[in-house]
């Protein structure tokens, strides 16, 4: 299996104007790069504080550190949010969203979405459509799956400036600031699959064979045939066509699978 890693400096949504604070963050970055710079899976460094307002000189010094600690050809690139100070003008890769590559003031660098499929995470956003507990049943799980499918599809409808993204988060988990768990995973906290898992599995080629991965031809019927189920039957598959039958084959439907945008 292929694996790439974005190594991020510790810190989130907090800045202190005391110069010592910035110095300690930069020291964290140096130690982080020294720890991981010989790992071939490292694709990017994220040397700034996540979702934090920081001054321009801090951002430029952080970028300089990534070059000082790995001053060789083919070094991992430095990435940060496109709207943060100094990033759009100086960094190697910027964090953005599908559509940023088509704006008049688009960045010159490649764009990567590091948390796709997620809406703004405030107190009310816990109710958004990409979050569903397995205990809620068929309809909420289908809404979540289709929401993530839409986010995934949007990344394919971009220019070559946009290079991909990573989903947040694979697993349901507890959080410190909300009484309810985060329900946005494609697995629950016990690693049980949701419908959304099948969405992403259906994006792998049917011809793929790998000893460590669930692969090959697949089909998943996202329908429980209960009294609460929708009239439409949603199927996730990587095959060319699907044949559904009910009542011992007395009714059968065969439908082609249309793969838009190559996925």
List each model region and its residues.
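Catalytic cores of secreted or luminal carbohydrate-active enzymes
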Residues: 166-263
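Substrate-binding/catalytic cleft of secreted carbohydrate-active enzymes
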Residues: 1-196, 216-219, 257
């Amino acid at each position: 299996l292929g694996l790439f890693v974005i190594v991020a400096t510790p810190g989130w949504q907090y800045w202190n104007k005391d110069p010592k604070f910035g110095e300690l963050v930069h020291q964290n970055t140096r130690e982080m790069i020294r720890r991981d710079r010989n790992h071939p899976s490292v694709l990017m460094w994220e040397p700034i504080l996540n979702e934090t307002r920081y001054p321009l000189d801090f951002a430029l010094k952080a970028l300089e550190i990534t070059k000082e600690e790995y001053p060789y050809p083919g070094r991992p690139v430095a990435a940060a949010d496109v709207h943060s100070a100094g990033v759009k003008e100086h960094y190697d890769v910027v964090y953005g969203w599908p559509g940023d590559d088509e704006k008049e003031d688009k960045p010159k660098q490649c764009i990567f979405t590091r948390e796709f499929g997620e809406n703004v995470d405030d107190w009310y956003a816990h109710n958004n459509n990409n979050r569903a507990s397995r205990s809620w049943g068929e309809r909420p799980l289908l809404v979540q799956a289709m929401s993530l499918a839409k986010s995934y599809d949007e990344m394919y409808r971009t220019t070559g400036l946009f290079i991909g993204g990573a989903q947040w988060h694979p697993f349901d988990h507890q959080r410190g600031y909300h009484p309810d768990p985060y329900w946005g995973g494609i697995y629950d906290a016990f690693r049980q699959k949701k419908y959304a898992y099948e969405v992403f599995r259906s994006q792998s080629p049917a011809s793929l064979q790998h000893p460590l991965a669930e692969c090959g031809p697949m089909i998943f019927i996202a329908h429980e045939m209960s009294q609460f189920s929708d009239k439409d039957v949603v199927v996730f598959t990587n095959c060319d066509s699907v044949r559904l039958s009910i009542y011992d084959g007395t009714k059968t439907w065969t439908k082609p699978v249309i793969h838009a945008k190559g996925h």
